[in-house]
Regions:
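Functional cores that coordinate and move charged inorganic groups
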Residues: 139-144, 150, 155-298, 302-308, ...
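Cofactor-/ligand-binding subdomain signature composed of acidic, glycine-rich
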Residues: 2-83, 234, 288-326
Length: 581
């Protein structure tokens, strides 16, 4: 389907992998060539690699002491615990930050009663380590602060903490600047001088490595860390880090924990999201659980999220869960409203820029949802997007990019105009003085225009392989499910099937009939119908209902509904066929 700008998605069929490798793997594993091709494209070429891909093992986790500064960090935590020094676990207000704080706080509480946590207020303090937070720590006698999912750029703040006699250990996964903060230890796999084998951990993942290292050094059995993995999988899924290597292993066991024996707070969230334990997937976290936990920090306070995730009884978990669910409903209506206003600004010419980038500003918008609105505008206009609002006298906002374009670099090129900025290649935050706004818009627009290519501005659907419906057998699907957990870098494969049509049961579903449920057939199997769902594609309904043939690209998902599990195609895009056969 078209985006608002009428940009049609370009379908790109990936080159097949080396046929010799595919043939060898297919024979060794006794699997379909299509599946062997998918595996080789994901770097799985040998029987051994296939074993560790299909059967993730906790033995595949890296030694946490390979991370720079880990030994110092562990010793400093040990000193705090043995001398009964007060430890403050400090983290960002989003899902990654609040799960990280909950994980490290829960662990430390087992060995010390002198532990507390602190989540900065999104509106009053903003992102990252704040002077207010350090003052609070100082006033309350804390000697050690452990920062999670933030701190890699907090040079002045760490110096300020030192003047109050407070040591800082930083656990972060954001991109560092040239000079690291003068902390006791800086744990960040993205450090230039770090040789840790995997650099795409979530913030919570870095916190977990600290806890794992502490346990390893002081004889605490790894089994006691397993109950923390439900928090970790929530961060890995919601923060959209790559689902490869160590992350995939941790997510695999985290999902197991989440489904079989989750903590009370996550159980409450699943129930409020109308999800059933035993069947939760990464998608459920990304689309249902993650946004709810995030809503606490967007609408009220991130502290609520930590209270939920560390709740020890059902009553507390349900009570806080319901409060957070209300926050999420408020967030939804506000983000709908602001998205509508932003779309209108772009269309009526009152945006700051609609050239190389989409840049919109409204001082009254809610700071908590600008990131979501930026993502919606990328969907609509498919170009790098910055959504700005006003907070505490500064202009502040969120930036989101399109595939292949490094927006962080573009923001960094305007560093002299900014009070602060941070983030990743595709998603970042920034703050500037109002007087610098016009120059910032002009400069970043020019920078983006000079770097971005037409290819990057065309939305693409990457297709893994062509498939005929007859190939989708129970065995094929059973093996495909073992590719999970899916996420960036290990996506649910996208298949292309040509010349299909609806078997006659096609109907519109959803509020306002914007989605379609279809029962598809292809010409080779006219009596074998495969159920499919197409979100936001009702524009094709009349064409399909008239019996016309079309091509689809889709992924195959398991649809769990009222005790029944069925296979379903989730359609990503539809193309009408010109020629009628």
């Amino acid at each position: 389907p078209l985006s608002i700008m009428g940009k049609e998605r370009k379908w790109i069929l990936k080159e097949p992998a080396d046929p010799e490798k595919v043939g060898r793997l297919s024979a060794e594993l006794g699997i379909d060539r299509v599946l062997a091709d998918l595996l080789v494209k994901r770097g799985v070429e040998t029987f051994e690699q296939a074993r560790s891909f299909f059967r993730p093992s906790l033995n595949d986790l890296h030694d946490p002491f390979l991370m720079k500064d880990m030994d110092v960090a562990v010793e400093r935590v040990r000193k705090a615990i043995t001398t009964e020094e007060k430890i403050l676990v400090y983290g960002d207000y989003d899902v990654d930050g609040t799960t990280a704080v909950s994980l490290v706080y829960s662990f430390l509480r087992r060995y010390s009663s002198k532990v507390d946590f602190y989540i900065p207020d999104r509106y009053d303090e903003g992102y990252g380590v704040s002077y207010k937070g350090i003052d609070w720590a100082g006033d309350n006698g804390f000697g050690l602060i452990i920062t999670l999912d933030c701190g890699i750029k907090a040079n002045e703040k760490v110096e300020y903490a030192a003047t109050k006699g407070i040591d800082v250990i930083i656990c972060d996964h954001h991109l560092p600047e040239n000079t690291l903060p003068p902390a006791v230890a800086v744990l960040d796999p993205k450090r230039e001088d770090d040789t840790y084998p995997f650099d795409d951990l979530s913030g919570c993942g870095v916190g977990f490595k600290l806890v794992q290292a502490y346990s390893q050094k002081y004889g605490i059995p790894f089994e006691t860390l397993i109950p923390l993995l439900d928090l970790l999988v929530v961060s890995i899924a919601a923060d959209l880090v790559t689902m490869v290597g160590e992350n995939r292993v941790l997510a695999h066991f985290g999902l197991k924990q989440l489904n079989e024996n989750p903590r009370k707070g996550l159980h409450a969230m699943a129930t409020l999201s109308k999800l059933e334990l035993g069947h939760l997937t990464i998608d459920d976290i990304v689309f249902k659980i993650g946004p709810r936990i995030n809503a606490a920090g967007r609408m009220e306070t991130g502290r609520l999220a930590v209270e939920l995730l560390t709740a020890s009884d059902d009553h507390t978990a349900t009570m806080i869960g319901e409060k957070i669910n209300d926050n999420n409903n408020d967030r939804k209506s506000i983000d709908r409203e602001i998205t509508q206003e932003a779309l209108e600004m772009v269309q009526n010419g009152s945006a700051l820029s609609t050239d190389a980038a989409t840049i919109v500003y409204n001082p009254t918008w809610n700071k908590g949802v600008v990131g979501i609105v930026a993502s919606r505008l990328v969907e609509a206009f498919y170009k790098p997007t910055i959504v700005l609002t006003k907070s505490n006298g500064f202009i502040t906002g969120s930036a989101r990019s399109v595939a292949g374009f490094d927006l962080y670099e573009a923001i960094e090129s305007c560093a002299d105009l900014l009070e602060n900025f941070g983030g990743h290649v595709y998603a970042a935050g920034l703050t500037l003085k109002e007087g610098n706004l016009d120059e910032f818009v002009g400069r970043i627009d020019q920078f983006i225009a000079g770097k971005i290519t037409d290819e990057m501005l065309t939305p693409v659907t990457d297709i893994d392989a062509k498939l005929e419906f007859s190939q989708i057998t129970p065995k094929f699907f059973r093996l495909l499910k073992q590719f999970q957990p899916f996420g960036p870098g290990n996506t649910n494969p996208v298949f292309l099937t040509e010349n299909v049509s609806d078997g006659g049961n096609g109907r519109k579903v959803g509020a306002g009939g914007v989605h379609m449920k279809l029962d598809l057939i292809d010409e080779k199997q006219p009596f074998h119908q495969i159920p499919a769902i197409a979100f936001n594609m009702a524009e094709f309904y009349d064409y399909i209902k008239a019996g016309n043939p079309f091509d689809i690209c889709y992924s195959i998902v398991e649809n769990y509904y009222r005790g029944n599990t069925t296979l379903q195609l989730r359609i990503k895009d539809i193309k009408e066929r010109d020629e009628f056969i």
